[in-house]
Structure formats: C-alpha cells, structure tokens
C-alpha cells in the first residue's frame, strides 16, 4: 500500500510562510533562552557592526549571530577556534529554513581558552607596536597630583594612600570603579580617558601620573585587564601610567601597554613618588658640597692672585717717570706762554702802526679808482650789447647756409666717386670675360692683341670666365675692323646755388 495521504483529504494546505513562522513560534516557545558550549568557527565581523559565527562540536554545528548592540557587552572577543559558553535565544530564519541562536552573552569555556585568546591578542598588539619601548613615557620625578584608578573600598586604596602620605606631600585624586567583572574594563577605560581629558589650569588639577591598581586574584578575576579596548585606551593616553594589577606573578595585557609595571599597589605608590626626607638629605648634602667647593675655589683664586701680585711693580714706581715728565713739561709751558704773549704783542703793535688816517686814505683812493675803472668798462659793454645781440641773431641763418653748402659738396663728391667706380669697372681686364669674351695668350704667355699676332698651327690658351682651354690656330686671319669708341657721356653740371646765397667753397 502507498504511504501517501489520500488526495481527497479535506485538511487545508499550509503556505510556505505559514509553516515557516509556525515552526519559528514552536521552537522559540519550547526552548527560549539556552546555554551552549562549543568551538567558534566562521567568525565574521560585518561592516554594520553585527557578528556572524558558527558554534560546533565534534558532531554538529549551529549558526549564531551577535547584534551590534550586544558586541561590546560580550565577555570575550569572538575569534575562530575559541571554546566558549554562550547564552541566547533559539530562533529560525524563515527566508532560508535555518535555525540559529541570537547570542546575548559569551564567556570562555576554560582557563586554557582564555590564555590562548590572550596570547593571540598580545601578538596582534605587539605587531601594531603598542608594546614598543620607545613608546614608554618617563615618570615625573616630583609629581604634584597623582591619579589613582581602583576600587574605593578594600586594602588596595588604603595601602596606596598610606604609602604616598609617608613619602611625598602631593594631592591624590581617586577615580572609583569596579575592578572585576564584565563592567570593569569599560569603567577603567572611562576613568583613564576622564583623567586625560582634564585640562591644565582648570578647576580640577590634572594628574602628573596615573596608577591603575587591583589586588590579586584568579585569571578570571583579572581578565577585565586583558581587554583589547582597555589596552588601546592606555596606549592613547598622554599621562604616564603605572599598572599594579594582581601580585608579582600575575601578568595582564595592561602591564605590557603601560609605561611602568609595579608588582604590587604599594610598589606603584613608591614608583610614582619620591621620598621627601631623602630629597631633603640629598639637597642638604649637595648644599654642603657646593659651599665647600665654592670656598675652596675662592681660596685657590686668592692664592693665585697674591702670587701674581708679587711680580707686579708698585703703583708709585709706575707713575714716577710720568710724573717727572709732567713736571718738566709744565715748567716749559710757562716760559713758552710768556714768549708767545710777547711775540703776539709785538705783531699787534706793528699792525696798529699801519692803521693811520693817511694809510686809510690811500687805500680808499685806490679802491675808488678801481671802482671808477669798472664803471667805465661796464658802460662800454652796455653800448656794445646791441651789436652782440644782432650778431647772435644771424647765427641760425649762417648755420643753415653752412649746412646746405656741406650737403651740396657731399653730393658732388658722391657723384664723382660713382663715375670713378664705373670707369674702374670698365678698365678691369676681367670685365670682357663677364660679357662672354675670351683672352688669348700665346705660347710664351704674352697676350695676343690682334689676328696678325697669331700664325697657323700656333698653340694658344683661351681664358674664359669659367676657366681656361688650350687651342691651335687654324687658317690665315685678316685685319679686324677697328672698333668704334663709344661716345662719352655728357658730364652733369652742378646745380646753380640759390640767388642771394653765397658759396663758402
């Protein structure tokens, strides 16, 4: 018999969507929230912030998704190969007939998985250079403000405050936060960013150094300080930071990124602050050494000065010779002043003797005669001035005549030069060659001037413009008719000068 249902059944058919959503409701109502343990694979961090992954064991696998809003709240970062325990809600994806788990929380399945994840994260941050020694900032030698990020209760904060109070007088700012659990990494990161955001000179003093402290605990207890976001926040800060998380044997990710690592919170307080008593003792010792050094230097300079002064002459000896020269010069000066006064008095008497009325009258007469002579010469020059003006008025006309005469002379000379050049060219022996004639030279090199100079069979040389040719005379020649000389060209007469204007040449 056939197992197929009868075709005449009256049961209403489901649509594909109705069946898919019915299965979805059944699955969600039956299971709700579940906890799964398995290994992560196919982890994909989408650009929109969601994370898609697969949770598998040795026999089966189930798809999972972490929505963007839940990614930051996960206890661990989803990575391929990590064994985890997830909590979420089972649902279906009707468009693909698949079921999946929507993950709300995630935690590592064991210490080994946590340490493996930590090693991968350490390698990643080290490759980015976050652990490089050159990034480490030096701690201030004498901080005025120390910022402490830790739990407000417990022995850690008491040990830090007590140790700082005993060593160094400074202000301590405590930023309280939880140091264990899922919220610890976010609160510690917020505290570090808050301290770095304080501006110098504001109402709240900006710390010179930060201490992140927590007591000892298990790997799970200290896991918040292995958070990647916390490590990057420490690296981005500008205030030097000391990490004091756990005991000396405990190592967290923040220890590699911080500027200094302290084995205990008490040691962190000692790293951050100097000892006031030691500084005072050091300053006192330096002051004593400086005073002794100064006194010794002054004594050495005084001894050297005394030794050098022994070789110097006495001041009176230095001035004795100059004083003697001064006394001699002052004695000579008195006598010289007396002689100078006598000479000038005699000169004054001679000058006053010449200033008589007769001498002044003679000088006046001479000056008057010279003045009269100058007046006569001035009158004569005034009478001749019109003639000089007329002569100067004729100068432009004379210059024009001189210029015209020079132009005519230049033109005549140019015409003569042109005629001479034409004559030179006509007398040039090479000129007939340019007109197609040839020069006939006999065997001895003489020029044949007529046919009678040549005999039959004689070898001659014909010179043309383009070159020479040898030839032999054949036949008897007769006298050539005498050439008629060309009539000479009439010589142009020079143009007559304009009427009323003379020729300077």
From Swiss-Prot:
It is found in: Cytoplasm. HAMAP family: Exonuc_7_L. This is Exodeoxyribonuclease 7 large subunit. Bidirectionally degrades single-stranded DNA into large acid-insoluble oligonucleotides, which are then degraded further into small acid-soluble oligonucleotides. Keywords: Cytoplasm, Exonuclease, Hydrolase, Nuclease. It comes from Caulobacter vibrioides (strain NA1000 / CB15N). It is an enzyme of class 3 (hydrolase). Residues 466-505 are annotated as: Disordered. Heterooligomer composed of large and small subunits. GO terms for molecular function: exodeoxyribonuclease VII activity; nucleic acid binding. The keyword Cytoplasm applies. It comes from the Bacteria.
């Amino acid at each position: 018999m056939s197992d197929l249902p009868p075709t005449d059944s009256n049961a209403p058919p489901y649509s594909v969507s109705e069946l898919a959503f019915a299965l979805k409701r059944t699955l969600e109502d039956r299971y709700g929230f579940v906890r799964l343990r398995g290994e992560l694979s196919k982890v994909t961090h989408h650009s929109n912030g969601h994370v898609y992954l697969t949770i598998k064991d040795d026999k089966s696998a189930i798809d999972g998704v972490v929505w963007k809003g839940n990614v930051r709240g996960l206890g661990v970062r989803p990575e391929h190969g990590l064994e985890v325990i997830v909590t979420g809600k089972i649902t279906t994806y009707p468009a693909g007939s698949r079921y999946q788990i929507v993950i709300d929380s995630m935690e590592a399945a064991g210490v080994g998985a946590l340490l493996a994840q930590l090693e991968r994260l350490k390698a990643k941050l080290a490759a980015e250079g976050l652990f490089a020694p050159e990034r480490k900032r030096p701690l201030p030698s004498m901080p005025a403000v120390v910022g402490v990020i830790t739990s407000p209760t417990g022995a850690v904060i008491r040990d830090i405050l007590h140790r700082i109070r005993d060593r160094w007088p400074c202000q301590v700012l405590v930023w309280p936060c939880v140091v264990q659990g899922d919220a610890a990494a976010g609160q510690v990161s917020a505290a570090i960013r808050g301290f770095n955001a304080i501006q110098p000179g504001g109402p709240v003093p900006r710390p010179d150094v930060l201490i992140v402290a927590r007591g000892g605990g298990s790997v799970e207890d200290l896991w918040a300080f292995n958070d990647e976001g916390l490590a990057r926040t420490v690296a981005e800060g500008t205030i030097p930071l000391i990490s004091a998380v756990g005991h000396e044997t405990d190592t967290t990710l923040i220890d590699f990124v911080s500027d200094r690592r302290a084995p205990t919170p008490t040691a962190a307080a000692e790293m951050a602050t100097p000892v006031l008593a030691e500084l005072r003792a050091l300053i006192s010792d330096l002051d004593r050494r400086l005073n002794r050094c100064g006194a010794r230097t002054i004594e050495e300079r005084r001894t050297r000065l005394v030794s050098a002064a022994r070789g110097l002459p006495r001041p009176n000896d230095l001035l004795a010779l100059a004083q003697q020269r001064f006394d001699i010069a002052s004695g000579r000066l008195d006598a010289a002043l007396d002689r100078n006064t006598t000479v000038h008095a005699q000169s004054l008497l001679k000058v006053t003797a010449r200033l008589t009325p007769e001498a002044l009258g003679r000088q006046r007469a001479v000056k008057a005669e010279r003045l009269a002579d100058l007046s006569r010469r001035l009158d004569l020059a005034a009478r001749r001035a019109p003639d000089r003006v007329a002569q100067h008025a004729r100068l432009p006309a004379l210059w024009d005549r001189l210029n015209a005469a020079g132009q005519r002379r230049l033109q005549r000379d140019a015409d003569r030069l042109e005629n001479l050049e034409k004559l030179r060219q006509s007398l040039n022996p090479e000129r007939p060659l340019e007109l197609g004639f040839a020069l006939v030279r006999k065997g001895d090199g003489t020029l044949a001037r007529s046919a009678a100079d040549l005999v039959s069979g004689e070898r001659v040389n014909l010179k043309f413009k383009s070159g020479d040719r040898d030839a032999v005379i054949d036949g008897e020649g007769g006298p050539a008719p005498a050439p008629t000389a060309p009539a000479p060209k009439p010589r142009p007469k020079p143009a007559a000068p304009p009427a009323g204007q003379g020729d300077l040449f």
